[in-house]
């Protein structure tokens, strides 16, 4: 399929930043498709609850660690004991089942909120050694954020990689032919709220580097325009409204500029405009269509999709324009760069593919159907994307090593254009 026709068919169709009211319910909830066979075993013991607790904190932590693809939590039915503190951990019981790390904790009501306390225990020593511990208060409505905080700290202590479980995702839900919602939720689908509703298509949300704004495409003025939406104030500003279509926005790493695609001169080209608007600068002027820009972490390079050689493939060029070189192979598109700049996540052969930018080696990550719009967690560990299941568009999650796969089934709608937020906490 020609890139222009593909683009045209698409066109035709913590929490301090967020002032909207959220609920503990979700549009989408992770459902495991394929577990991890080679990940590190870990035990997350059910947290002792001193009074009623509105969420299963231990289960949330276990799910987070599993979703990363780095850990295989022991099933609760196979736990040899359920200690509430490190002092109660019998190392031999855990090493006998091949578990070196155990997470224990308690949740205690604190007048309008909860105190969440945990310990990460190393069972290779006897008595067991506490590797990390913490206790903090959270409002009742943010009990899941408390659990995600534990997950982040445990994940980082063991892997030396920052956890990304307190991040969010933005995505578009389409219901029928004239109902579109841009929604934001926790990375696992909970605490979802609507940013904007429209009777016209909404597309391609992208986060600003500080997580305070979303750039996206709207047809509300009967043409495709790029707007920037401030999530704190709710205000919106049109930043790209060239003649014809405007789409595929991407913030620069410093948040000062937005790259986007427009066909105002007939074919699609890449432009850059200030994040508050202004006069766009055209970066590409080659034959063929150029779209889907994505910045490198240092802002020096833009990756994009072009059909200048006959079929779509990923190219890269300097962020000021100029010559471009092919990167992804024929049929590749939707490229995003990992936060460390080492890998390119893209679509090739309708699958999510990872390309090592140093070696050129590629690895197919997904096993779903008609995949598109991959977005990478800020620590590079997980990828969310959209795929086709039956007659529906659904969100999927895959670890960046391809070992863990899950779907986020949604109720009553087509779920498209997922975008993973940056870190939202210090």
From Swiss-Prot:
It holds the Pfam family PD40. One of its GO terms (cellular component) is periplasmic space. The keyword Cell cycle applies. GO terms for biological process: cell division; protein import. Keywords: Cell cycle, Cell division, Periplasm, Signal. Part of the Tol-Pal system, which plays a role in outer membrane invagination during cell division and is important for maintaining outer membrane integrity. Belongs to the TolB family. The Tol-Pal system is composed of five core proteins: the inner membrane proteins TolA, TolQ and TolR, the periplasmic protein TolB and the outer membrane protein Pal. They form a network linking the inner and outer membranes and the peptidoglycan layer. This is Tol-Pal system protein TolB. It comes from Actinobacillus pleuropneumoniae serotype 5b (strain L20).
